[in-house]
């Protein structure tokens, strides 16, 4: 039996649909009805249909259900059934209104899905239709009308109705898919392999993908794609992906879907696999497309492309020579050209007034060179997309420190300013101990070149007690010129700059080097742009320069010792989307991402050869996290609580264990990193220093000593400011800035909503500026035990903070064993709604 639908089409009769509708009318009156009574009414409706072949329509069936309900005395239920029919009619009207407004019938299915998945009254499409109608103008194109519909959903997003942002994402994805379909038809693309061939021919895809996989493998991999996962995105995340990460044609039209992007990245990352390669493609694709793991911006943006620079972080040790300084500038320019961020250590460069080749008082100091770094950052602007980014590090005992601390402040001599770079200071324990004990004590600043000339050693090459002995040796040596200041004056300069500019960043060098698992191969002078990397460093040196003849031409050949030019490849576990309590699943996911990051080392396009050499020697990776506050909120755990500290202590210990185990298994399969012998991993000192003495940890230590480690460094927590937006989660390990706010971008107001915001999580999401920062620092100290590198820790202060209070935060961070502090983010105290009920 065929039933005529409202649009004139027919479908096979299904008696269960009638039964479901009858039961719904009883549920609404909170009465029960037996199956016998339900099917009695269904039988009566069927009898009518058999007797009235010309009236077998949906409307007549519903009329008969109403009549039958009333005949059996179910008047209240019949009334509710009538109301149900009316509501369904209204929903159809709204649907029709939106479809007519967009002029696109194909949007109907998306709208019906939205009605089904967001059934609450606050997400009625009536609100969308009203807002959309107000945006529409008679002369709009179809594309402009779709854009207006998306905008309408975005503007309906509030902290009371946060899911409008997911509805907006569905509509945006429909618009994107429509464009992609048009592009594919125009280009004659009918399969994923066709698309990769087209993109490769256009120079938008690296030819290495098609060279590595057969057409059959490509199409098998295409079957891994799950378009349903597009629904995981909120508007902010999908919009950011579409604008900055999806491949576009040379006319800036999108040519790649979100799932195609993730599969393309997975295909690239799995290329080095010798066995079960497609299985690894699927594993990499799954963790990325489920938003459980985010790769760092360079990997997300550049994997699968011709210039596949996949690394985020680079660190250079600037030597004290003209040739060396300009080489470092050139290194920075090349790194910036390909989208990397840079850290530069200037602690070896002689101070202003130092000697050059025996001429006294002629050195210009580090500020002049930093101004060149500043200009390079501005000049090399990544194809006019954004200027370069660099943090410059200087030791707290360097003679140029006072001027350095005023690089970005608004007062003083503008010729001594560099507003586009980020200063950072390296502190020994002694400085903080003296600052805590008595701010009126004297601190002495030196020229590193003078120390080397007079004493025969570099002070910066030592740490801990050995450094303190040599520092006091310098203080007591009358042959060395000193610039003496009270610690109070230095601290005042540091704190004023921090409050005014957010910088300098903090690098606690003794804490870092004591925990260095590869101290047998060098020292760590500083961190990177975002303060999460801590790896061995050394200067690049020219060994010799020769004039030779090659093929009849005269050539100049330089022999260069590459030093340790730090490079790190990053990814983050999205804690808010992961089953943190499920140890088995977490081990598997951590092992998968560790493998992916290790493959990046083989696949990377290196902007300079020194980075490639260091990366292959150490094979360092930086696995971090995002969604930290998100994970706490969905579990009902308050930031300012011992439960927070206890929970995350266990989480990070498990992550560390899983990462070490995964790296060791990779070493068994592919070989250990070059400098494993003699490392804390090999000797077991790594585990002893951290008190990992349970049977499980002891067994792992034995396995590591026997099998080796694939990676010299493993964990580092980056800020994840962009990738956390894509994943729809909170940034790094930061608390949320606000539960909900509007951000203006290119004339549009974009909603930013705390993830999983609801009545249950509302009070858990306390603003970063209202949070007691001592809890954040204590949590960072607890995490630090389980992180072999460092973490991007931001401090949030209001204008009510005194300089003494800010100093106390720095001191607490040092006492808690925190290796680095990133920004001090200050803000005028805003009028907030009453939060006294939060407790």
Where are these regions (language model features)?
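Alpha-helix capping and helix-loop boundary segments enriched in small/acidic/polar residues
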Residues: 9-13, 33-36, 101-102, 140, ...
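Terminal amphipathic helices with adjacent charged low-complexity linkers/tails
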Residues: 80-87, 164-196, 427, 512-535, ...
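Polar, glycine-rich mid-to-C-terminal structural blocks
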Residues: 406, 419-494, 498-501
């Amino acid at each position: 039996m065929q039933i005529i639908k409202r649009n004139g089409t027919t479908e096979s009769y299904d008696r269960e649909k009638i039964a479901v509708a009858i039961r719904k009318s009883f549920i609404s009156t909170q009465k029960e009805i037996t199956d016998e009574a339900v099917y009695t009414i269904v039988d009566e409706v069927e009898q009518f249909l058999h007797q009235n072949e010309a009236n077998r329509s949906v409307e007549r069936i519903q009329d008969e259900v109403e009549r039958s309900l009333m005949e059996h005395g179910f008047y209240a239920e019949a009334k509710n059934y009538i109301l149900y029919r009316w509501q369904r009619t209204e929903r159809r009207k709204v649907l029709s209104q939106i479809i007519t407004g967009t002029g696109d019938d194909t949007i109907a299915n998306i709208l019906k899905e939205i009605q089904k998945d967001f059934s609450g009254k606050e997400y009625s499409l009536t609100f969308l239709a009203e807002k959309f109608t107000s945006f529409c103008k008679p002369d709009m194109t179809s594309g402009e009308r779709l854009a207006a519909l998306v905008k309408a959903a975005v503007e309906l997003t509030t902290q009371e109705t946060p899911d409008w942002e997911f509805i907006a994402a569905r509509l945006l994805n429909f618009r994107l898919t429509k464009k992609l379909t048009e592009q594919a038809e125009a280009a004659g693309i009918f399969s994923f392999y066709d698309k990769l061939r087209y993109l490769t021919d256009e120079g938008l895809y690296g030819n290495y993908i098609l060279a590595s996989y057969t057409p059959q493998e490509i199409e098998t991999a295409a079957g891994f794609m799950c378009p349903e996962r597009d629904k995981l995105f909120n508007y902010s995340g999908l919009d950011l992906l579409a604008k900055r990460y999806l491949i576009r044609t040379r006319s800036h039209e999108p040519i790649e879907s979100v799932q195609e992007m993730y599969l393309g990245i997975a295909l690239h990352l799995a290329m080095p696999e010798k066995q079960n390669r497609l299985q690894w493609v699927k594993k990499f694709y799954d963790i990325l497309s489920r938003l459980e793991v985010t790769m760092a911006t360079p990997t997300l943006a550049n994997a699968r492309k011709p210039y596949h620079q996949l690394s985020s972080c680079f660190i250079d040790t600037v030597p004290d020579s003209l040739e060396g300084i300009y080489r470092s500038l050139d290194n920075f320019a090349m790194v910036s050209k390909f989208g990397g961020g840079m850290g530069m250590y200037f602690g070896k460069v002689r101070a202003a007034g130092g000697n050059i080749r025996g001429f006294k008082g002629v050195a210009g100091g580090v500020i002049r060179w930093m101004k060149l770094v500043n200009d390079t950052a501005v000049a090399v602007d990544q194809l006019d997309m954004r200027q370069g980014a660099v943090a410059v590090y200087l030791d707290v005992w360097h003679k140029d420190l006072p001027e350095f601390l005023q690089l970005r402040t608004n007062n003083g001599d503008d010729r001594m300013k560099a507003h586009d770079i980020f200063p950072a200071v390296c502190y020994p324990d002694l400085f903080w101990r003296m600052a805590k004990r008595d701010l009126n004590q004297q601190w002495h600043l030196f020229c590193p070149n003078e120390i080397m000339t007079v004493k025969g050693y570099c002070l910066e090459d030592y740490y801990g007690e050995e450094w303190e002995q040599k520092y006091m040796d310098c203080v007591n040596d009358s042959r060395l010129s000193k610039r003496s200041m009270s610690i109070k004056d230095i601290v005042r300069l540091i704190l004023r700059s921090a409050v005014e500019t957010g910088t300098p960043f903090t690098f606690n060098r003794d804490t870092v080097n004591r925990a260095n698992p590869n101290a047998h191969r060098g020292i760590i002078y500083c961190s990177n742009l975002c303060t999460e990397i801590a790896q061995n460093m050394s200067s690049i040196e020219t060994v010799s320069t020769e004039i030779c003849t090659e093929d009849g031409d005269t050539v100049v050949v330089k022999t260069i010792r590459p030093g340790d030019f730090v490079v790190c490849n990053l990814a983050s576990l999205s804690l808010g989307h992961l089953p943190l309590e499920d140890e088995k699943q977490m081990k598997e996911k951590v092992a998968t991402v560790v493998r992916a990051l290790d493959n990046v080392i083989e696949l990377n396009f290196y902007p300079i050869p020194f980075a490639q050499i260091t990366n292959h020697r150490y094979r360092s990776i930086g696995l971090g996290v995002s969604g930290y506050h998100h994970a706490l909120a969905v579990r009902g755990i308050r930031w300012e609580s011992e439960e927070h500290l206890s929970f995350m202590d266990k989480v990070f210990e498990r992550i560390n264990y899983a990462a070490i185990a995964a790296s060791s298994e990779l070493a068994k399969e592919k070989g250990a990193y070059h400098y494993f012998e003699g490392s804390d991993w090999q000797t077991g000192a790594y585990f002893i220093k951290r008190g990992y003495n349970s049977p499980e940890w002891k067994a792992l230590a034995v396995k590591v000593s026997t099998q080796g480690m694939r990676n010299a460094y493993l964990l580092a927590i980056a800020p994840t400011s962009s990738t956390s937006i894509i994943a729809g989660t909170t940034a790094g390990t930061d608390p949320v800035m606000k539960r909900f706010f509007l951000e203006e971008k290119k004339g549009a107001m974009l909603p930013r909503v705390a993830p999983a915001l609801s009545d249950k999580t509302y009070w858990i999401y306390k603003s970063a500026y209202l949070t007691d920062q001592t809890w954040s620092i204590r949590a960072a100290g607890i995490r630090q035990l389980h992180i072999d590198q460092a973490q991007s820790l931001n401090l949030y202060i209001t204008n009510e903070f005194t300089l003494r209070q800010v100093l106390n935060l720095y001191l607490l961070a040092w006492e808690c064993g925190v290796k680095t502090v990133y920004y001090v983010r200050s803000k005028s105290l805003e009028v907030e709604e009453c939060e006294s009920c939060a407790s």
